[in-house]
């Protein structure tokens, strides 16, 4: 049995009044296990609305929402903290070649002393992908690209010469140095059947978003992941399930399809229900000013929950082993 792990999702917004680095420092001071950030380098107004940002910035309508580049943001956070894990939630592969994914992840893992968990996804916003100048891809091709990217990334971390031919991405005599000093977990944000099967076969974790993966769908989704894990010769619980959940601590507020709200007791009760679905961790996404209050009033009760889980997040021994040289 493992204690439930709790992280906090910080904003990637670069609008006036936002300070995600300060929020991450606060999260570490209040004992959270990790911080995460979305990856939307070209976030149109439709994306902002879907993620709950709203269509406004600095009090005016926006066509493209102001955001930080996620890996740059997390690197700066790593430099300002010492313990807390860092998770891109999740890097969209169409924006980055696999060799860049592999190289930047190794560098960030080394510089952060082993604190990186690499979140990856196939990408889902065609408007963002087109705006960034990436080649147009079908949903099937994006899934092919994600699978290729994971294969190339893991091979580059482990082997001196990588030759790979994939449906979307390939590598010829690729040799990345240095290699990671410790394993870098890969979490996927998959939603559909093919992505869930890939998660079960190759991933270390699954980090779905409440607004896109409703609780009533979770049992079937987890069953797909577990079946794929077993078919690949892995344990059924090989994949850690971490739910990204927007939360609001307010006794007057009520939960909606995309938000868990209420008193501290209300929130704990609802999150406990999610552990009964099979989640072994939470990525809480509060308003920035509520990060301390959640840590004091909600997180201790969550940590009292004992749940079966496949593995813990990076340990202090792992962090020390990954010291930058």
Language-model features: where?
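Active-site-adjacent structural elements that line small-molecule/cofactor binding pockets in enzymes
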Residues: 1-325
């Amino acid at each position: 049995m493992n204690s439930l792990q709790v992280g906090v999702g910080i904003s990637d917004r670069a609008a006036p009044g936002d300070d995600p680095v300060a929020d991450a420092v606060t999260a570490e001071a209040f004992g959270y296990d990790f911080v995460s950030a979305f990856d939307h380098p070209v976030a149109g107004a439709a994306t902002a609305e879907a993620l709950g940002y709203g269509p406004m910035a600095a009090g005016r309508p926006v066509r493209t929402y102001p955001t930080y580049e996620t890996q740059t943001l997390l690197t700066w956070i790593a430099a300002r903290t010492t313990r807390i894990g860092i998770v891109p939630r999740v890097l969209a592969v169409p924006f980055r070649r696999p060799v860049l994914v592999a190289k930047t992840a190794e560098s960030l893992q080394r510089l952060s002393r082993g604190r990186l968990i690499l979140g990856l996804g196939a990408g889902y916003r065609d408007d963002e992908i087109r705006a960034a100048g990436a080649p147009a891809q079908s949903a099937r091709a994006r899934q092919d690209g994600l699978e290729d990217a994971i294969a190339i990334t893991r091979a580059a971390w482990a082997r001196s010469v990588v030759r790979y031919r994939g449906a979307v991405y390939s590598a010829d005599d690729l040799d990345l140095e240095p290699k990671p000093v410790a394993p870098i977990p890969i979490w996927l944000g998959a939603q559909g059947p093919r992505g869930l099967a890939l998660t079960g076969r190759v991933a270390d974790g699954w980090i779905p978003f409440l607004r896109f993966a409703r609780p009533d769908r979770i049992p079937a989704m987890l069953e797909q992941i577990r079946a794929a894990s077993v078919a690949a010769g892995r344990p059924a619980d090989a994949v850690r399930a971490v739910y990204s959940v927007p939360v609001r601590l307010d006794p007057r507020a009520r939960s909606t399809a995309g938000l868990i709200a209420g008193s501290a007791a209300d929130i704990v009760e609802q999150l406990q229900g999610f552990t009964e679905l099979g989640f072994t961790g939470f990525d809480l996404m509060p308003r920035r000013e509520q990060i301390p209050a959640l840590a004091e009033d909600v997180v201790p009760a969550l940590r009292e929950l004992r749940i079966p889980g496949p593995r813990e997040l990076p340990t202090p021994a792992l962090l020390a082993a990954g010291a930058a040289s």
